[in-house]
Amino acid sequence: MADLLSLDAQMPLIANIDTGPLWGASADRGQVQRHLDTGADDGPAADWSVGHFTNPVDVQRGTGGAIVTVRDTYPALGGGIHLQPASRFAAALRRDDGREGGVLCVCDAGRAAGLERDLAARGLQVRHWDNGTPEPSSG
């Protein structure tokens, strides 16, 4: 995620995640700081486990862990912004719930080919996302 965020601050990222692995909205600043300092993973359990689109905007690194700042469309959970351990956000992105996850990188059309090369060079898979919707028949 940090690699994607470092590519271009003007390129919004939209992540398709499973919320189950995330910390719950009641995580406090002390838990966040402990994670940054020691890697402790003592945050609250997730509030729910559903497929959800979010906007990761920053990664803060500490001596023991990293925290992803995630914008969200549900202001009731974290006021529209959550602070999540990077390892939990990665698990949410993997979507171990049997569904597809991933990150949509939004850029100007003229930059798409270069972005695709940059992402592939970082070892990321670049492809169309299949949400399971059947393709329309051609006849």
Positions of predicted regions on the chain:
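Active-site-adjacent substructure of cysteine-protease-like catalytic cores
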Residues: M1-R71
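Noncatalytic regulatory segments and standalone regulatory/sensor domains
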Residues: D37-G51, D58-G139
